[in-house]
Amino acid sequence: MSERTHWRDYLALTKPGVVMLLMVTAVAGMFLATEPAGMVPLATFIPAFVGLSLAMMASAAINQIMDQKIDAIMKRTEKRPLVAGKLTPKAAITFAVLLATASMIMLYFLVNPLTAWLTLFGFVGYAFIYTLYLKRATPQNIVIGGIAGAIPPLLGWTAVTGEAHPYAWLLVLIIFVWTPPHFWALAIHRRDEYAKADIPMLPVTHGIPFTRESVLYYTILLFICTLLPYLTGMSDLIYLLSALILGLVFLYHAVRLRFSEDPKLPMKTFGYSITYLFALFTALLVDHYLPVTPANVASWLGA
Protein backbone atom coordinates (compact mmCIF):
# COMPACT_ATOMS: atom_id res chain seq x y z
CA MET A 1 0.00 0.00 0.00
CA SER A 2 1.28 3.42 -0.95
CA GLU A 3 -0.44 5.22 1.91
CA ARG A 4 -1.41 4.41 5.46
CA THR A 5 -4.71 2.58 5.62
CA HIS A 6 -7.49 4.60 7.23
CA TRP A 7 -10.94 3.54 8.36
CA ARG A 8 -12.35 5.82 5.66
CA ASP A 9 -10.74 3.57 3.04
CA TYR A 10 -12.70 0.60 4.35
CA LEU A 11 -15.84 2.73 4.38
CA ALA A 12 -15.24 3.81 0.77
CA LEU A 13 -14.86 0.15 -0.18
CA THR A 14 -18.48 -0.41 0.84
CA LYS A 15 -19.97 2.32 -1.41
CA PRO A 16 -21.82 4.02 1.47
CA GLY A 17 -23.89 6.27 -0.79
CA VAL A 18 -25.30 3.30 -2.70
CA VAL A 19 -25.87 1.32 0.50
CA MET A 20 -27.70 4.28 2.04
CA LEU A 21 -30.13 4.53 -0.88
CA LEU A 22 -30.77 0.79 -0.87
CA MET A 23 -31.31 0.79 2.89
CA VAL A 24 -33.93 3.52 2.50
CA THR A 25 -35.92 1.08 0.36
CA ALA A 26 -35.26 -1.78 2.79
CA VAL A 27 -36.44 0.25 5.77
CA ALA A 28 -39.49 1.32 3.79
CA GLY A 29 -40.22 -2.35 3.18
CA MET A 30 -40.02 -3.02 6.94
CA PHE A 31 -42.50 -0.31 7.91
CA LEU A 32 -44.84 -0.91 4.98
CA ALA A 33 -45.11 -4.52 6.16
CA THR A 34 -46.76 -3.37 9.39
CA GLU A 35 -50.43 -2.63 9.87
CA PRO A 36 -51.40 0.99 9.08
CA ALA A 37 -49.71 3.25 11.63
CA GLY A 38 -47.96 0.20 13.09
CA MET A 39 -44.34 0.10 14.20
CA VAL A 40 -41.55 -2.40 13.67
CA PRO A 41 -40.40 -3.93 16.99
CA LEU A 42 -36.88 -2.84 17.89
CA ALA A 43 -35.96 -6.49 18.47
CA THR A 44 -36.61 -7.02 14.76
CA PHE A 45 -35.59 -3.65 13.37
CA ILE A 46 -32.08 -3.46 14.83
CA PRO A 47 -30.74 -6.87 13.72
CA ALA A 48 -32.52 -6.56 10.36
CA PHE A 49 -31.12 -3.08 9.73
CA VAL A 50 -27.60 -4.03 10.77
CA GLY A 51 -27.68 -7.40 9.01
CA LEU A 52 -28.96 -6.03 5.72
CA SER A 53 -26.54 -3.10 5.85
CA LEU A 54 -23.60 -5.45 6.37
CA ALA A 55 -24.69 -7.65 3.46
CA MET A 56 -24.95 -4.69 1.10
CA MET A 57 -21.60 -3.35 2.26
CA ALA A 58 -20.02 -6.77 1.70
CA SER A 59 -21.43 -7.09 -1.82
CA ALA A 60 -20.19 -3.58 -2.68
CA ALA A 61 -16.74 -4.45 -1.37
CA ILE A 62 -16.58 -7.63 -3.44
CA ASN A 63 -17.73 -5.64 -6.46
CA GLN A 64 -14.72 -3.33 -6.05
CA ILE A 65 -12.38 -6.28 -5.52
CA MET A 66 -13.58 -7.92 -8.74
CA ASP A 67 -13.59 -4.66 -10.70
CA GLN A 68 -10.18 -3.40 -9.62
CA LYS A 69 -8.68 -3.51 -13.13
CA ILE A 70 -11.74 -1.88 -14.66
CA ASP A 71 -11.82 0.81 -11.97
CA ALA A 72 -8.19 1.69 -12.74
CA ILE A 73 -9.16 2.52 -16.34
CA MET A 74 -12.24 4.64 -15.62
CA LYS A 75 -11.89 8.21 -14.36
CA ARG A 76 -15.01 7.89 -12.20
CA THR A 77 -13.49 5.04 -10.19
CA GLU A 78 -9.73 5.59 -10.42
CA LYS A 79 -9.51 6.93 -6.86
CA ARG A 80 -11.20 3.98 -5.19
CA PRO A 81 -9.11 2.57 -2.29
CA LEU A 82 -7.93 -0.61 -4.04
CA VAL A 83 -6.96 1.23 -7.21
CA ALA A 84 -5.21 3.97 -5.24
CA GLY A 85 -3.26 1.38 -3.25
CA LYS A 86 -4.78 2.39 0.07
CA LEU A 87 -5.97 -1.18 0.68
CA THR A 88 -4.48 -4.51 -0.34
CA PRO A 89 -6.73 -7.08 -2.04
CA LYS A 90 -6.10 -9.43 0.90
CA ALA A 91 -7.29 -6.84 3.41
CA ALA A 92 -10.33 -6.04 1.28
CA ILE A 93 -11.27 -9.71 0.87
CA THR A 94 -10.90 -10.35 4.60
CA PHE A 95 -13.06 -7.33 5.37
CA ALA A 96 -15.76 -8.38 2.88
CA VAL A 97 -15.85 -11.96 4.19
CA LEU A 98 -16.21 -10.72 7.77
CA LEU A 99 -19.07 -8.41 6.79
CA ALA A 100 -20.87 -11.13 4.83
CA THR A 101 -20.44 -13.73 7.56
CA ALA A 102 -21.67 -11.41 10.30
CA SER A 103 -24.64 -10.46 8.12
CA MET A 104 -25.73 -14.03 7.44
CA ILE A 105 -25.39 -15.08 11.09
CA MET A 106 -27.35 -12.07 12.30
CA LEU A 107 -30.13 -12.41 9.75
CA TYR A 108 -30.52 -16.18 10.10
CA PHE A 109 -30.53 -16.37 13.88
CA LEU A 110 -31.86 -12.97 14.96
CA VAL A 111 -34.32 -12.18 12.14
CA ASN A 112 -35.53 -15.24 10.19
CA PRO A 113 -34.11 -17.83 7.76
CA LEU A 114 -36.17 -16.58 4.78
CA THR A 115 -34.63 -13.12 4.99
CA ALA A 116 -31.17 -14.65 5.31
CA TRP A 117 -31.62 -16.86 2.23
CA LEU A 118 -33.09 -14.05 0.12
CA THR A 119 -30.24 -11.79 1.20
CA LEU A 120 -27.76 -14.47 0.17
CA PHE A 121 -29.49 -14.66 -3.23
CA GLY A 122 -29.13 -10.90 -3.70
CA PHE A 123 -25.55 -10.97 -2.46
CA VAL A 124 -24.47 -13.70 -4.87
CA GLY A 125 -26.49 -12.17 -7.70
CA TYR A 126 -24.83 -8.78 -7.45
CA ALA A 127 -21.36 -9.56 -6.14
CA PHE A 128 -20.68 -12.52 -8.40
CA ILE A 129 -23.22 -13.15 -11.19
CA TYR A 130 -23.57 -9.49 -12.18
CA THR A 131 -20.03 -8.33 -11.41
CA LEU A 132 -18.11 -11.33 -12.73
CA TYR A 133 -20.28 -12.32 -15.68
CA LEU A 134 -23.20 -10.13 -16.73
CA LYS A 135 -21.38 -6.80 -16.54
CA ARG A 136 -18.75 -8.08 -18.95
CA ALA A 137 -20.99 -10.23 -21.14
CA THR A 138 -24.08 -8.34 -22.32
CA PRO A 139 -25.42 -4.79 -22.78
CA GLN A 140 -28.51 -6.00 -20.91
CA ASN A 141 -26.33 -6.54 -17.83
CA ILE A 142 -28.20 -4.13 -15.60
CA VAL A 143 -31.59 -5.38 -16.79
CA ILE A 144 -30.87 -9.05 -16.13
CA GLY A 145 -28.85 -8.36 -13.01
CA GLY A 146 -31.27 -5.72 -11.80
CA ILE A 147 -33.30 -8.16 -9.74
CA ALA A 148 -30.41 -8.55 -7.29
CA GLY A 149 -30.26 -4.83 -6.68
CA ALA A 150 -34.04 -4.48 -6.51
CA ILE A 151 -34.76 -6.84 -3.62
CA PRO A 152 -33.96 -4.67 -0.54
CA PRO A 153 -37.63 -3.73 0.08
CA LEU A 154 -38.53 -7.42 -0.12
CA LEU A 155 -35.81 -8.19 2.41
CA GLY A 156 -37.15 -5.51 4.72
CA TRP A 157 -40.67 -6.86 4.36
CA THR A 158 -39.74 -10.48 5.03
CA ALA A 159 -37.64 -9.42 8.02
CA VAL A 160 -40.83 -8.19 9.69
CA THR A 161 -43.41 -10.71 8.46
CA GLY A 162 -41.43 -13.79 7.50
CA GLU A 163 -43.26 -13.96 4.16
CA ALA A 164 -42.81 -12.57 0.66
CA HIS A 165 -46.08 -10.68 0.23
CA PRO A 166 -47.16 -9.58 -3.29
CA TYR A 167 -46.94 -5.95 -2.18
CA ALA A 168 -43.26 -6.48 -1.41
CA TRP A 169 -42.73 -7.84 -4.92
CA LEU A 170 -44.47 -4.75 -6.26
CA LEU A 171 -41.79 -2.62 -4.60
CA VAL A 172 -39.15 -4.86 -6.16
CA LEU A 173 -40.77 -4.32 -9.57
CA ILE A 174 -40.57 -0.54 -9.19
CA ILE A 175 -36.84 -0.60 -8.42
CA PHE A 176 -36.23 -3.21 -11.14
CA VAL A 177 -37.80 -0.93 -13.78
CA TRP A 178 -36.11 2.17 -12.30
CA THR A 179 -32.63 0.64 -12.62
CA PRO A 180 -32.12 0.82 -16.43
CA PRO A 181 -32.91 4.53 -16.92
CA HIS A 182 -30.88 5.31 -13.81
CA PHE A 183 -27.73 3.50 -14.95
CA TRP A 184 -28.05 4.13 -18.68
CA ALA A 185 -28.15 7.89 -18.08
CA LEU A 186 -24.80 7.55 -16.31
CA ALA A 187 -23.52 5.21 -19.01
CA ILE A 188 -24.27 7.80 -21.70
CA HIS A 189 -22.13 10.32 -19.84
CA ARG A 190 -19.35 7.76 -19.28
CA ARG A 191 -19.66 6.03 -22.65
CA ASP A 192 -16.02 6.48 -23.68
CA GLU A 193 -14.73 5.21 -20.34
CA TYR A 194 -16.84 2.06 -20.57
CA ALA A 195 -15.60 1.52 -24.13
CA LYS A 196 -12.00 1.93 -22.99
CA ALA A 197 -12.58 -0.60 -20.21
CA ASP A 198 -14.23 -2.99 -22.71
CA ILE A 199 -17.50 -3.07 -20.78
CA PRO A 200 -20.48 -3.67 -23.14
CA MET A 201 -22.80 -1.03 -21.71
CA LEU A 202 -25.71 -0.13 -23.97
CA PRO A 203 -24.25 3.18 -25.27
CA VAL A 204 -21.09 1.29 -26.27
CA THR A 205 -22.81 -1.57 -28.11
CA HIS A 206 -25.92 0.13 -29.50
CA GLY A 207 -24.96 3.79 -29.58
CA ILE A 208 -26.07 6.82 -27.60
CA PRO A 209 -29.26 7.60 -29.62
CA PHE A 210 -30.60 4.07 -29.00
CA THR A 211 -29.76 4.38 -25.31
CA ARG A 212 -31.55 7.72 -25.07
CA GLU A 213 -34.67 6.08 -26.52
CA SER A 214 -34.35 3.18 -24.10
CA VAL A 215 -34.15 5.55 -21.13
CA LEU A 216 -37.39 7.19 -22.28
CA TYR A 217 -39.21 3.88 -22.82
CA TYR A 218 -38.21 2.53 -19.42
CA THR A 219 -39.17 5.81 -17.76
CA ILE A 220 -42.64 5.54 -19.30
CA LEU A 221 -42.87 1.95 -18.04
CA LEU A 222 -41.71 3.09 -14.62
CA PHE A 223 -44.39 5.78 -14.53
CA ILE A 224 -47.02 3.10 -15.14
CA CYS A 225 -45.56 0.70 -12.57
CA THR A 226 -45.52 3.34 -9.86
CA LEU A 227 -49.30 3.70 -10.16
CA LEU A 228 -49.78 0.06 -9.15
CA PRO A 229 -49.47 0.59 -5.36
CA TYR A 230 -52.51 2.87 -5.56
CA LEU A 231 -54.42 0.74 -8.04
CA THR A 232 -53.94 -2.41 -5.94
CA GLY A 233 -55.01 -0.74 -2.70
CA MET A 234 -51.55 -0.76 -1.17
CA SER A 235 -51.39 3.04 -0.95
CA ASP A 236 -53.70 6.02 -1.05
CA LEU A 237 -53.86 9.57 -2.38
CA ILE A 238 -50.70 11.04 -0.84
CA TYR A 239 -48.63 8.40 -2.59
CA LEU A 240 -50.60 8.69 -5.84
CA LEU A 241 -50.11 12.45 -6.03
CA SER A 242 -46.42 12.09 -5.19
CA ALA A 243 -45.90 9.33 -7.76
CA LEU A 244 -47.60 11.40 -10.46
CA ILE A 245 -45.54 14.53 -9.78
CA LEU A 246 -42.24 12.68 -9.37
CA GLY A 247 -42.95 10.56 -12.43
CA LEU A 248 -43.82 13.52 -14.63
CA VAL A 249 -40.58 15.24 -13.66
CA PHE A 250 -38.66 12.05 -14.48
CA LEU A 251 -40.44 11.90 -17.84
CA TYR A 252 -39.50 15.54 -18.45
CA HIS A 253 -35.84 14.67 -17.91
CA ALA A 254 -36.11 11.55 -20.10
CA VAL A 255 -37.81 13.43 -22.95
CA ARG A 256 -35.18 16.18 -22.85
CA LEU A 257 -32.45 13.54 -22.82
CA ARG A 258 -34.04 11.85 -25.84
CA PHE A 259 -34.36 14.96 -28.00
CA SER A 260 -31.51 17.21 -26.84
CA GLU A 261 -27.77 16.89 -27.36
CA ASP A 262 -26.98 18.94 -24.25
CA PRO A 263 -24.01 17.09 -22.67
CA LYS A 264 -25.21 18.01 -19.17
CA LEU A 265 -28.53 16.19 -19.48
CA PRO A 266 -27.33 12.61 -18.86
CA MET A 267 -25.93 13.49 -15.43
CA LYS A 268 -28.93 15.67 -14.62
CA THR A 269 -31.17 12.70 -15.40
CA PHE A 270 -28.95 10.38 -13.39
CA GLY A 271 -28.96 12.75 -10.42
CA TYR A 272 -32.71 13.18 -10.51
CA SER A 273 -33.24 9.42 -10.67
CA ILE A 274 -31.61 9.10 -7.24
CA THR A 275 -33.75 11.88 -5.78
CA TYR A 276 -36.77 10.28 -7.41
CA LEU A 277 -36.33 6.88 -5.80
CA PHE A 278 -35.67 8.36 -2.36
CA ALA A 279 -38.72 10.64 -2.62
CA LEU A 280 -40.98 7.89 -3.97
CA PHE A 281 -40.26 5.53 -1.09
CA THR A 282 -40.57 8.39 1.38
CA ALA A 283 -44.01 9.09 -0.08
CA LEU A 284 -44.95 5.43 0.40
CA LEU A 285 -44.06 5.71 4.08
CA VAL A 286 -45.85 9.02 4.62
CA ASP A 287 -48.94 7.61 2.93
CA HIS A 288 -48.78 4.49 5.10
CA TYR A 289 -48.89 6.53 8.30
CA LEU A 290 -51.08 9.39 7.08
CA PRO A 291 -53.57 7.69 4.75
CA VAL A 292 -55.77 10.03 2.72
CA THR A 293 -58.50 8.18 0.84
CA PRO A 294 -61.11 9.48 -1.61
CA ALA A 295 -63.70 8.91 1.14
CA ASN A 296 -61.69 11.09 3.53
CA VAL A 297 -61.48 13.86 0.96
CA ALA A 298 -65.22 13.68 0.26
CA SER A 299 -65.93 13.89 3.99
CA TRP A 300 -63.66 16.92 4.42
CA LEU A 301 -65.38 18.65 1.50
CA GLY A 302 -68.78 17.90 3.01
CA ALA A 303 -69.84 15.75 0.08
From Swiss-Prot:
Principal subcellular localisation of the protein: membrane
Location relative to the cell: Cell inner membrane
Membrane spanning residue stretches: 17-37, 42-62, 91-111, 114-134, 142-162, 168-188, 208-228, 231-251, 270-290
EC class (word): transferase
BP terms from Gene Ontology: heme O biosynthetic process
Pathway connected to this protein: Porphyrin-containing compound metabolism; heme O biosynthesis; heme O from protoheme: step 1/1
Keyword terms of this UniProt record: Cell inner membrane, Cell membrane, Heme biosynthesis, Membrane, Transferase, Transmembrane, Transmembrane helix
One GO cellular component term noted in the UniProt record for this chain: plasma membrane
Domain of life: Bacteria
InterPro entries (alphabetical): Protohaem_IX_farnesylTrfase, UbiA_prenyltransferase, UbiA_prenylTrfase_CS, UbiA_sf
Annotated catalysed reactions: heme b + (2E,6E)-farnesyl diphosphate + H2O = Fe(II)-heme o + diphosphate
Pfam families, sorted: UbiA (PF01040)
Molecular function, one GO term: protoheme IX farnesyltransferase activity
E.C. designation(s): 2.5.1.141
Task of the protein: Converts heme B (protoheme IX) to heme O by substitution of the vinyl group on carbon 2 of heme B porphyrin ring with a hydroxyethyl farnesyl side group.
NCBIfam families: cyoE_ctaB, PRK04375.1-2
Family: Belongs to the UbiA prenyltransferase family. Protoheme IX farnesyltransferase subfamily.
Note: Carbon 2 of the heme B porphyrin ring is defined according to the Fischer nomenclature.
Name of this chain's protein: Protoheme IX farnesyltransferase
Species for this entry: Alcanivorax borkumensis (strain ATCC 700651 / DSM 11573 / NCIMB 13689 / SK2)
Gene (name only): cyoE
